Swiss-Prot record:
Native organism: Bos taurus
Domain of life: Eukaryota
Similarity comment: Belongs to the TDE1 family.
Name by which UniProt lists this protein: Serine incorporator 2
Coiled-coil intervals, chain numbering: none
One Pfam family named in its UniProt record: Serinc
One term of GO molecular function: phospholipid scramblase activity
Protein encoded by which gene: SERINC2
GO terms classed as biological process: plasma membrane phospholipid scrambling
Chemical reaction(s) catalysed: a 1,2-diacyl-sn-glycero-3-phospho-L-serine(in) = a 1,2-diacyl-sn-glycero-3-phospho-L-serine(out); a 1,2-diacyl-sn-glycero-3-phosphocholine(in) = a 1,2-diacyl-sn-glycero-3-phosphocholine(out); a 1,2-diacyl-sn-glycero-3-phosphoethanolamine(in) = a 1,2-diacyl-sn-glycero-3-phosphoethanolamine(out)
């Protein structure tokens, strides 16, 4: 009898994995909307891939595998499996990260194409989006295995340029999310101040605004100290000075009387967040300057005693501070994409989302009280399925560039830092500032449109 009950329990779990609606772990999620849970589960797939990439980049993993003669082949072949052994050089390091991230991007791109023009959960494709997680996992694993059988050839070099473009776009998405976050934060605290008739909320906004600007000024000083030299590093000096000037200009525009009249919720908090993010992107750009005099991280990667030489003679490296901070920012932004519920109309338009609290009938209220997922998209989807998966495609290529520190695979299998990475990040910072400036002046330039 116990065995039968256990089998029934397993079949119940299997139905959750293979069915058209998620139910595992839903009791742990307050207000379990299908729209939110599905995004979270897809994000888990992304984080699993990132975890595999981190393991593949670990400097101790490859050396330990080579101690097992029955596992690794010490040759330099381009295939993964050779005469019953594994070419560990293909399974580890930057080449492996390229393949793993290619698999993730292909997986999410497949769903992006599949979910085009899904308008509500009544579309049969919505059941695929919100369920069948076991089969999705099998597809994910299958694509990953296939990616490791791609011959070396020019794959890494071609995929590098895909990563450059995708990462540029994702940097802009991160900035849009920060605009959304800062706007929501500012609006909620202002509402709290009016409701409670307390100046503590205003003091809190002032404190964090001052903190973010102080961090930005500190970042500028540190960038000048560590990434410039007297009589050299002119590009870095121009980038730092120009971005600082642009941030000051944007901050002034944010508090102009006409801007305040058109957008009462705009202010220095949002501008301070954007300024800090711009300094962060500037730091990422300068960490890729291919000049040892102007880039201390380049010395770390290629200095004496700090480079790990693989069995094929190419050089690998472990992460530096920009890579670690970039990974943390990536994780936070990806989670925010999955959980965001925004009331910023301009950001919603750019992000193709319009998250509205659903009106629950009696049956749905009972489902919520029981801790199960319920369908809140019968009358219309709360976000664009296809665009969400496209964001995860961009996230996949961005994390590939972050983990490999934007180094381009060279003919000698060394990872080479190039000016391409520098200019892409600097241009992303300029484009991001222009996007934020547009959110400020759009109501003035287009008075006939509703930006409320």
């Amino acid at each position: 009898m116990g065995a039968c009950l256990g089998a029934c329990s397993l079949l119940s779990c299997a139905s959750c994995l293979c069915g058209s609606a998620p139910c595992i772990l839903c009791s742990c999620c307050p207000c379990s909307h299908n729209s939110t849970l599905s995004r979270l589960f897809f994000t888990v797939f992304l984080f699993l891939g990132v975890l595999v990439c981190v393991i593949m980049l670990s400097p101790g993993v490859e050396s330990q595998l080579y101690k097992l003669p029955w596992v690794c082949n010490e040759g330099t072949g381009s295939h993964v499996v050779l005469q019953g052994h594994i070419d560990c050089g293909s399974l580890l390091g930057h080449r492996a990260v390229y393949r793993m991230c290619f698999a993730m991007a292909a997986f999410f791109f497949l769903f992006s194409l599949l979910m085009v023009c899904v308008r509500s959960s009544r579309d049969p494709r919505a059941a695929i989006q919100n369920g069948f997680w076991f089969f999705k996992f099998l597809i994910f694993v299958g694509i990953t295995v296939g990616a490791f059988y791609i011959p070396d050839g020019s794959f890494s070099n071609i995929w590098f340029y895909f990563g450059v473009v995708g990462s540029f776009i994702f940097l802009l998405i991160q900035l849009l999310l920060l605009i959304d976050f800062a706007h929501s934060w500012n609006q909620r605290w202002l509402c709290k101040a009016e409701e409670c008739d307390s100046r503590a909320w205003y003091a809190g906004l002032f404190f964090f605004t001052l903190l973010f600007y102080a961090l930005s000024i500190t970042a500028v000083a540190l960038l000048f100290v560590y990434y410039t030299q007297p009589g050299a590093c002119y590009e870095g000096k121009v980038f730092i000075g120009l971005n600082l000037t642009l941030c000051v200009c944007v901050s002034i525009v944010a508090i102009l009387p006409k801007i305040q009249d058109a957008q009462p919720n705009s202010g220095l908090l949002q501008a301070s967040v954007i300024t800090l993010y711009t300094m962060f992107v500037t730091w990422l750009a300068l960490s890729n300057v291919p000049d040892q005099k102007c880039n201390p991280h380049l010395l770390t990667h290629f200095g004496n005693g700090t480079v790990l030489a693989g069995p094929e003679g190419y050089e690998t490296h472990w992460w530096d501070a920009p890579s670690i901070v970039g990974l943390v920012v990536f994780i936070l932004c990806t989670v925010f994409i999955s959980l965001r519920s925004s009331d910023h109309r301009q950001v919603n338009s750019l992000m193709q989302t319009e998250e509205c609290p659903p009106v629950l009938d009696a049956t749905q209220q009972q489902v919520v009280s029981e801790g199960r997922a319920f369908d809140n998209e019968q009358d219309g989807v709360t976000y664009s399925y296809s665009f969400f998966h496209l964001c995860l495609v961009l996230a996949s290529v961005h994390i590939m560039m972050t983990l490999t520190n934007w180094y381009r695979p060279g003919e000698t299998r060394k990872m080479i830092s190039t000016w391409t990475a520098v200019w892409v990040k600097i241009c992303a910072s300029w484009t991001g500032l222009l996007l934020y400036l547009w959110t400020l002046v759009a109501p003035l330039l287009l008075p006939n449109r509703d930006f409320s």
